[in-house]
Amino acid sequence: MKLLNLASNNSFWRGIDYHHENRIIGWKELAENCYQGKVRGSGNAVYDVTIDTAHPRKSACNCPFAEGRRVICKHMIALDLGIFPEKEQQMMDYIEEQNQMYEQEYEKEMQEREEEIREYVMKLSKAELREKLIQRMINDLYY
């Protein structure tokens, strides 16, 4: 999944779209971990794509975005998924796992913050509490 991990968010999702749209015209294995193929791009353009799954930064494509640069483009992603379709599900599982971890961390942070607020408010005197409430209500008038 190295190649997929190195792609920008946009290249990754567009590459998945290209894979689903069957834009891979053909491919062949050049050597172990090295593949060459043709991917149909926008309009009638067809791009020559070479991917090296062991060394993704050695991958190449002659599209305007990637030509002469060491970046991962949507055509490389499409070719990689065309050759190894199981990678898509693995990546989706990984993304889901990361989202769940993020949501759990966010929920924990919110609970901690809520507890801090409760503790702070409970320490305020009645007069301080009234003043904070008045300030907030006045603030809300303008925002």
Regions found by a protein language model. Give the residues of each.
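Long, low-complexity, compositionally biased intrinsically disordered regions
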Residues: 1-143
